[in-house]
Each structure stands twice: as structure tokens, then as C-alpha cells.
Design a protein with these regions (language model features):
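Intrinsically disordered, low-complexity Ser/Thr/Pro/Gly-rich regulatory segments
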Residues: 1-105, 109-222
Length: 222
């Protein structure tokens, strides 16, 4: 996929989910089909499976992450994260608000089988998040927000009784850029391209990256 192609393709699919073959060209269409990024609709049009997946492939092939991110909206990003978590057995709450000040996580995920929870914020729309200094500030705020959530957990049990089954929580920030990754202020910073791998191997990465583990004071062992 040529660099000029990737931006045009992202533009088309960010505007509508399905496009006519003539809008892409046969060579580009064939490549997208081979990469399993699109499928054929009822009338022969090509429909995108995931704009985020297309964005990740574009970045891997050399497209600028900052420019690529302009074709994504926060719903695309969070939907991809939520889908990956659901596939891994997590209960998912998007735009999870809590506390009198209405703090919010983009996604809160809990797995009652492993008794683990993950509080997630998605940072994809600004080049400033490629700065390690800025990301350090963001991670610190995220960690403090997670601590406040756990302090507030008793008030959340009425609406979310599953919290009783979660023993510990981790903080996670998902980015589109790969320039900053690892553990910052005890919070995992994971490029979206590696998100599925991180979730599937959570125990390994938590230990390897020294991600802070916060105990849930509302946990009740059954």
C-alpha cells in the first residue's frame, strides 16, 4: 500500500463504512481483501471491518501516526479496545463515570474468572501524547483517578455488583503512537497495535513492566 493510498483509503472509510470498487481501484481493493481489512457487501461494494485495524496497518507500512489519527474518532478507538476485551472474556463498561465529580474512564473492564480489572483511557488524537514528558503527566493523573475509583467503590456496588468479584486493578493507557510504551508512573502505556497481545498475556506484562497493582477494598472472596 503506497503512502498516498493509505491516507485516501482512511479518508474514504472514515466518511462511510462501504465504498464502491471504483473509488479504490482494483489493485488497492485486492490488497485490502487479501489483508482481510474489508469484505464485499451485498451489491459488490467493499465494507471496512475496522477503521482502527486499517489505521494500524497503515502505520506499520510507514504512514504518519499523527496524520492517521485524524481519520479516527474516539468511538472507533474505544470500540476496538472494547471488542478485544470482550473477546478475551471481560465485561466491558464504556465511558464509565464515577464519584461526585464524575471522573471517567474511557473503558472499565472486569474479568470475574481471573478477578482482575483494568481501567483504560485512550489517547489517540493529539501528537502531544508522543512526548514522554506529557505521557508521564497523563499516567500520573490516570493512576490517581484509579485510586479515587477504588476509594469510591462502595458507592458503585449498587449499579455494578460485579466489582465485589474483582480482587485487583491495573491502569492502562492505549495510544496510536509507538514512540512511548512500557510502564510510566506504574501505568501500562500500550500502542494500539500491541493491545490484543498485552491483554492475552496480561500477567506476563504486568510483571515484566512492573505495572502497579491496586487492591480492590470492595473485593469479597467467595
Amino acid at each position: 500500500m503506497r503512502l498516498t493510498d493509505c491516507y485516501n483509503i482512511l479518508r474514504l472509510f472514515s466518511e462511510k463504512p462501504c465504498v464502491k470498487l471504483g473509488e479504490l481501484g482494483s489493485d488497492v481493493a485486492e490488497e485490502l481483501i487479501n489483508l482481510e481489512l474489508v469484505y464485499r457487501g451485498i451489491s459488490g461494494e467493499l465494507c471496512i471491518r475496522s477503521v482502527v485495524q486499517l489505521a494500524m496497518v497503515s502505520i506499520k507500512q510507514g504512514c504518519d501516526p499523527t496524520k492517521v489519527s485524524t481519520y479516527l474518532n474516539w468511538r472507533d478507538f474505544e470500540a476496538f479496545v472494547a471488542e478485544a476485551l470482550l473477546e478475551s472474556g471481560y465485561e466491558v463498561f464504556k465511558n464509565f463515570r464515577f464519584g461526585v465529580k464524575k471522573w471517567e474512564f474511557d473503558v472499565l473492564a472486569v474479568n470475574t474468572t481471573s478477578s482482575l480489572g483494568i481501567a483504560i483511557d485512550c489517547k489517540h488524537w493529539s501528537p502531544k501524547y508522543s512526548s514522554s514528558g506529557k505521557m508521564r503527566d497523563v499516567a500520573l493523573v490516570h493512576l490517581e483517578k484509579l485510586k479515587k475509583f477504588l476509594d469510591w467503590c462502595n458507592y458503585e456496588l449498587l449499579d455494578h455488583p460485579l466489582l465485589r468479584k474483582i480482587k485487583k486493578f491495573y491502569g492502562l493507557i492505549v495510544t496510536i503512537s509507538e514512540s512511548v510504551r512500557g510502564s510510566i508512573q506504574g501505568v501500562a502505556v500500550v500502542p494500539i497495535y500491541y493491545f490484543r497481545d498485552f491483554i492475552e498475556n496480561l500477567g506476563y506484562y504486568v510483571e515484566e513492566l512492573k505495572v502497579v497493582t491496586l487492591k480492590n477494598p470492595c473485593y469479597i472472596q467467595e
